[in-house]
Regions:
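Surface-exposed, interaction-prone regions used to assemble/regulate multi-protein complexes
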Residues: 1-120
């Protein structure tokens, strides 16, 4: 899981990706965040959270850093939002080094990402 998250962060950094948008579809209990020049026709980067149990985030994330929850964060989130056994808490740190810092999260079974052009 950490390798996938590192891959996402490295790809975003190396390709100048600063913002991702959540697709307005929720299919197969999955959510997708995408990035591309013209999202109405195509996108070239996709992060998919699979078998989502709970989501707490905005539709658009600027300068997100995706990571696993710390043990303390995991315990606090599960206490407040549900245990969801077998699922992982993924954290999105947004605007981390600014006064606008926010922390969002998704509780899901897995995640994956693609770096290929997809036409809508």
């Amino acid at each position: 899981m950490k390798n996938k998250l590192n891959g996402i962060q490295n790809y975003m950094k190396n390709n100048g990706i600063y913002e991702v948008q959540m697709l307005d579809k929720f299919e197969d209990n999955s959510i997708k965040f995408i990035e591309g020049i013209d999202l109405s026709t195509a996108y070239s980067f996709e992060i998919t959270f699979k078998k989502v149990a709970y989501i707490h985030c905005l539709m658009s994330l600027y300068e997100p850093e995706f990571r696993l929850a710390t043990e303390e964060e995991d315990n606090e989130i599960r206490k407040n939002y549900g245990a969801y056994p077998g699922k992982t808490v993924f954290i999105f740190d947004v605007d981390k080094d600014t006064e606008y810092y926010n922390k969002y999260f998704v509780i899901a079974e897995d995640l994956d990402y693609k770096t290929e052009l997809v036409f809508r």
